[in-house]
A protein has these predicted regions:
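Intracellular juxtamembrane helix-capping segments at the cytosolic ends
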Residues: 105-118, 406-420
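C-terminal transmembrane helical hairpin of 12-TM major facilitator-type secondary transporters
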Residues: 361, 367-410
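Hydrophobic core of transmembrane alpha-helices in multi-pass small-molecule transporters
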Residues: 79-83, 87-106, 392-406
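Helix-to-loop junctions at the C-terminal end of transmembrane segments
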Residues: 46-62, 352-366, 450
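Intracellular loop-helix junctions on the cytosolic face of multi-pass helical membrane proteins
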Residues: 87-90, 106, 120-307, 475-487
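Loop-to-transmembrane helix entry/capping segments in MFS-fold secondary transporters
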Residues: 30-31, 120-130, 336, 419-431
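Helix-loop boundary and gating motifs at the non-cytosolic
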Residues: 1-43, 236-237, 294-298, 302-327
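C-terminal ends and interior cores of transmembrane alpha-helices
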Residues: 69-88, 376-388
């Protein structure tokens, strides 16, 4: 049931290892790259809760989650074929929007799929298997341009403004693998029917399990909070414009205002007798389980760190360890290829560590296991500024890989044990908000931090990311795992 993640992660690995390279090749400046990357988090912010809500209510001959697997796979594969042929930065950015939207359509139901199909006792192992496939696919996906250059003699350089052939062919192969892997999952697994799901989850007796059967909210409170958020967002927007702050901050100001409008709309719709759709999504978001709220803070700081790596890994490694920022130079492209190797190492480590996580969780707890993973990852990121020899950076990547394994396994195993099965999809989608919000914050602020705090030295963004991950580890200590596999 997790085999489709091979395809999903091929898409992510190619994107994470090569997108900044593509943007720089097409003429984007370093401090503009975070804003171009904003497609990934915004797509997830919008699409995952909607797809989760819809898939919770879908049942046809393909099943509940599978129709979304198929749609997302077709669109993502097409985007992978088109993206490396982008003639300009803005075409590449548009393809990134399409790719990320499509990946989210596939990925969100696939996480809920594991929650649907496995018992509490099996969920840590189930998400660990997903982590293995994610790591294994990322190793090959990240290495593809390097393999094509060094094994098949496909050039990794091109004329100014053109994408190297090795990168193009890597994306073509990735598109084929994406659709093939997802189709394998679709045709080799059988989903449980709604009736079977009900029978499997008769143990749910707490309030959360019955939440939504009779939705009730206080419109006055929603009107009040909605107005506060709307006004705060508008004031923030005015300040950004008046003081000519970085335009990426509009992402934050608009987001605050729009969420306020959603609160107002939910209150209005509820008064008219509508309790589904937007009303239910906003209600569920405002009334999420306590454990989910605790995990949200951990996830915010963890993904801020990971997004620092995704955005600045190429510029940090090429400038600090290979001594150049010129995308046309051989040293730059060698450094960019080495970043692909580094990405493959941390994903490879994650794939191997995934097998140890269920054992560690049984010996200690899921919370303790994840705390250890985050501390090791934070120190690994910070060490990128200490090691000068590029080969020693693989040690740093081993640490990051351990954190990556925990990040992809433990929060989802804990979450799927504390949310009602009828809302597995929508809550998995909502949890993604706490993955993408830090990415939006990063995209809105990292360009400012790079120039104002670090004088353009992107290696320091790796240190900042490491500090953020250590903070996440401290916050994880306070998470209460309410699942039956908690101990």
């Amino acid at each position: 049931m997790s085999f489709g993640y091979i395809g999903i992660q091929f898409g992510f690995a190619l994107q994470n290892s090569n997108l900044s390279r593509i943007f720089e090749t097409l003429g984007a400046k370093q401090d503009a790259i975070p804003a171009l990357w904003i497609a990934a988090p915004v797509s997830g912010l919008i699409i995952q809760p909607i797809i989760g809500y819809m898939s919770d209510r879908t049942w046809n001959r393909l099943g509940r989650r599978k129709p979304y697997f198929l749609l997302g796979a077709i669109l993502a594969s097409l985007a992978l074929l088109v993206m490396p042929n982008s003639p300009t930065v803005w075409v590449a950015a548009g393809m990134l929007w399409m790719l990320d939207a499509s990946i989210n359509i596939t990925m969100q139901p696939m996480r809920a799929f594991v929650g649907d199909m496995l018992s509490d006792e099996q969920k840590t192992k189930g998400f660990a298997v997903q982590t293995f496939f994610i790591g294994a696919a990322s190793v090959v996906g990240s290495l593809l341009p390097y393999i094509l250059t060094n094994c098949l003699n496909i050039s990794n350089t091109a004329s100014p403004g053109l994408i190297p052939p090795s990168v193009k062919w890597a994306f073509y192969v990735g598109g084929l693998i994406y659709i093939s892997a997802v189709l394998w999952t679709i045709f080799s697994t059988k989903e449980y029917s709604p009736e079977e799901q009900e029978a499997f989850n008769v143990h749910e007796t707490d309030a959360a399990a019955k939440e939504g059967d009779e939705l009730s909210l206080d419109p006055a409170k929603y009107y009040a909070s909605g107005m506060v958020l709307l006004i705060a967002g508008l004031i923030f927007t005015f300040l950004v414009k008046h003081y000519t702050w970085d335009r990426a901050l509009y992402i934050l100001s608009f987001g605050i205002a729009i969420y306020g409008m959603f609160q107002l709309a939910a209150a209005k719709l509820f008064i008219t007798g509508i309790k589904g759709g937007l009303v239910e999504i906003i209600y569920d978001l405002n009334n999420m389980p306590k454990t989910m709220r605790q995990l949200a803070w951990v996830t915010l700081f963890t993904w801020f760190a990971m997004f620092a790596w995704f955005i600045y890994c190429t510029s940090a490694i090429t400038s600090y360890h290979f001594g150049t920022s010129d995308p046309l130079s051989k040293e730059y492209n060698d450094g960019a290829d080495w970043v692909g190797v580094m990405n493959s190492v941390y994903n490879g480590v994650a794939a191997l560590v995934a097998f140890a996580l269920p054992v560690a969780a049984r010996k200690t707890s899921r919370v303790t296991t994840h705390v250890i993973c985050l501390f090791i990852g934070g120190l690994g990121m910070m060490s990128l500024n200490i090691f000068k020899d590029p080969h020693l950076l693989l040690i740093s990547m081993a640490g990051l890989g351990i954190a990556w394994a925990g990040l992809l396994t433990m929060p989802y195993a804990i979450l799927s044990s504390v949310v009602p099965h009828k809302k597995m999809g929508v809550y998995m989608g909502m949890f993604n908000l706490f993955v993408v919000i830090p990415q939006i914050l990063a995209a809105a602020t990292m360009g400012l931090m790079l120039n104002k705090w670090f004088d353009g030295h992107s290696i320091n963004m790796m240190v900042l990311g490491g500090v953020s991950m250590l903070i996440a580890g401290v916050l994880m200590m306070f998470v209460k795992d309410g699942g039956r596999e908690a101990q």
